Amino acid sequence: MPINSFENYPMSWKPSIDKAEKPIYKALAGQLEQDILNGVLLPGTKLPPQRELADYLDLNVSTISKAFKVCELKGLLSATVGSGTFVSYDALSNAYLLEDTKPTHLIEMGAILPDHASYEPLLYQLKNMVHEEDYEKWFSYGRAGESLWQKDAAVKLIQRGGFETSVDHILFANGGQNAIAATLASLCKPGDRIGVDHHTYPGLKTVASLLSVQIVPIKSENDEMSPESLEYACKNENIKGLYLIPDYHNPTTSFMSVENRRMVADIVKKYNLFVIEDASYHLLNKNPLPALASFAPQQVIHIASLSKSLAPGLRLAYVAVPRQYKEPISKALYNLNITVSPLLAELTARTIVSNQFEVLIESHREQTIRRNQLVNRYVAGYTCLGVETGIFRWLLLPGKMSGAEFEELAARLGVQVYAAERFVVGNSCPERAVRVSVCAPKTLEELEQGLMILRRLLDDLT
């Protein structure tokens, strides 16, 4: 029997469970998950203290702890030292933002894609490859990435993005997401924690959830990770690693200053953290800043993805890995992939060593600048963060409408944007903002049409 009476006692959650269902902690976790997904418990709700809930249900505190842990590993809850346990602000984002309720014709301004520029340099290389006498080898398994000259090409591309490395550090992955998954799978075990920005790349969140790796939001200061907050997390949150997007941060478009990169590098070296540096957007910058890996080469796994800067269909990423992590990450990539596509590895390497990749990048950059000029014209008077070479922008909303509400309303009118709720981490409060993909619309006319709709929505909010 409970020690105290709870008849008139205020509690944010008073579950009712069948104690005959064993194990009890799983039944309680299932009830908690359903109450979150069904909207009984809203994002940001603080749950009762574990001892209080244990008394109410007449259960051991350890049973409550296990149930909370199950939901925490699923990303439904966020526990903060000294503050308690909360329903994560992003707990419902996948449930209500990804439903298949889109109109038949929707102007795509949510997904991040480079512009639809000419892929002539790639086509030229591809035609040459398939007309070679031994063209069959491009369609076999092979050992793509083992060729030294292909690794030389990888080094050239990574150096172009701001990091000096060598071939003995290079691994090949089937895209950036694949490289992130392999890194977390090899360096983390279930329950381990990694630090991230309070809004971050959703693909990182899904991989972490799949592997039961917890992500801890680190507070920002002046639009970049606060060294003081990072140090606090190292001391009190027991984080094992860090995930960062230093350039064209997804979704907020911010850049880490060189000084901030140095300070973060000093902290990760001090606490021996591994760092995943997502360099998906480095090449968009004509004069890239030094990569974070430049300041902590023994700690940072530098991932140079090609889909955002060259072509979405190039599902390939070059990974510069510190020696201490190379063997476990290499094994993880092998177990996940066996190999990368010999066709894509060869095509990409030829495009790089011939310098044709510079033609592709410059073409993308010119088109992106033109598109951003349109964006600036239509959202003039509103706060739309980002630079002219960025392929997405971060639109801060006037009034009191949430990003999720704006996304839903925009979709009804024929435009897809992505709300801050898709990107928020744990119990961080989502900004009232949406991410707007500048280059996803197929034509300038389609982009302009989408911007006109967004402008009308913004004007209605003021």
UniProtKB/Swiss-Prot annotation:
SMART domains: HTH_GNTR. GO terms for biological process: biosynthetic process. Its cofactor is pyridoxal 5'-phosphate. The keyword Transcription applies. Residues 50-69 bind DNA. The keyword Iron does not apply. InterPro entries: Aminotransferase_I/II_large, HTH_trans_reg/aminotransferase, PyrdxlP-dep_Trfase, PyrdxlP-dep_Trfase_major, PyrdxlP-dep_Trfase_small, Tscrpt_reg_HTH_GntR, WH-like_DNA-bd_sf, WH_DNA-bd_sf. Residues 22-90 form the HTH gntR-type domain. The modification N6-(pyridoxal phosphate)lysine is found at residue 308. GO terms for molecular function: DNA binding; DNA-binding transcription factor activity; pyridoxal phosphate binding; transaminase activity. PROSITE patterns: HTH_GNTR (PS50949). This is Uncharacterized HTH-type transcriptional regulator YdeF. It comes from Bacillus subtilis (strain 168).
